[in-house]
Amino acid sequence: MHAVVINVSFTDFAAAKAELSGLVPRVSGAPGFVAGYWVALSQDKGTSIVVFDSEDSAQMLVGMVEGAPAMSVTVDSVEVGEVMAHA
């Protein structure tokens, strides 16, 4: 399994929360999706961890993120890594 870790800065926290209702179903419907977590670290920063069954599937999400129009967040970083353990 591979995870996509996305760190963002919120430009509009309330709008970002509202946009999740459309974003989460699109991501969870992606091929190879295993699990996803969207976390508000503060009113200014957030992170998400989305797990896929393969690196290729994870890289597809990276392409979606990089090609997405700016909305209520600024993407600070996107990284893919191998899941070493889970519980």
Predicted regions and their residues:
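Short S/T/G/P-rich N-terminal loop/turn motif that feeds into the first structured element of a domain
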Residues: M1-T47, D53-M64, V73-A87
